[in-house]
A protein has these predicted regions:
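Flavin (primarily FAD) cofactor-binding/catalytic cores of flavoenzymes
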Residues: 1-254
Length: 254
């Protein structure tokens, strides 16, 4: 991640830097959301409720939940903070490190042996520039269609230029033969939720696809009623036998 790269540069893993600038489009260097109930976004029950929502609501939720997958781990943030504190407050070294949130790099120009970066501040619309010998991009991945699909594209229904329309069972909507299907994973975050690019539900996704391919439930995907009722009308109560599994007694010995 960008945080790991910054920490490596700060520690001189590639040699001591005269100056380090960490530019981020986010308004702060936010922590990964690892709250207990945030983990519930990565469950089949949540996906079931998410997929039936209106498109604008789904986009809103994805924005709200972004830090559950894209945030910086608490350990990394604390390590960076301690490194900076020790360097500048304890050792009193020159402040040659800058953290620059709320900025986008709009232009990258060759400047002698290095580079000149032009930046725009999102909040006050100010414009800045800086020069650097080395520029490291930590901007993630760009969505792209597989190169094997061009001949099939006229038959595939698209949501937009780079997004397929994916059904609940991970089949693509298309006008090809009904007995044939194209399955897609990591291609439907807009309809299947923030967990779709993650490995946490790989076993469940794979089982659902195999059940669909086989035309029978080889894998039992039934689940007890969820503790969190994500949608209105979810009135199922926890089953007594399921509750009994969590009953326990405590013995205290002194």
């Amino acid at each position: 991640s960008g945080a790991d790269l910054f920490l490596n540069a700060l520690r001189g893993e590639w040699g001591e830097a005269a100056e380090i600038n960490w530019v981020s489009r986010r308004n702060n260097f936010n922590a990964l959301d690892e709250a207990a109930f945030a983990d519930e976004y990565f469950t089949p029950e949540y996906i079931s409720g998410f997929s039936g929502l209106k498109e604008d609501i789904r986009h809103q939720l994805l924005d709200e939940q972004k830090m559950t997958s894209d945030g910086i781990t608490a350990d990394s943030l604390l390590t960076i903070y301690r490194e900076l504190y020790h360097r500048f407050e304890v050792l009193r070294k020159p402040r040659n490190i800058r953290l620059l949130p709320s900025r986008s790099v709009t232009t990258l120009e060759s400047s002698g042996p290095g580079w000149k970066l032009l930046m725009e501040h999102h909040l006050d619309r100010g414009r800045e520039s800086l020069e650097s010998d080395v520029v490291i991009f930590a901007t993630g991945y760009r969505s792209a269609l597989p190169q094997i699909l061009p001949s099939l594209m006229p038959l595939i229904t698209m949501h937009d230029k780079n997004t397929f329309k994916v059904r609940d069972d991970f089949t693509l909507e298309w006008s090809g033969p009904k007995e044939n299907n194209i399955f897609a994973v990591n291609a439907s975050m807009q309809t299947h939720g923030i967990a779709e690019p993650q490995l946490s539900l790989m076993a469940w996704r794979s089982a659902r696809i195999l059940n669909r391919v086989l035309g029978r439930d080889l894998f039992d995907l039934s689940m007890p009623p969820a503790l969190i009722q994500w949608r209105s009308g979810s009135r199922k109560k926890p089953q007594p036998e399921a509750a009994a599994l969590t009953h326990y007694t405590t013995n205290i010995q002194e």
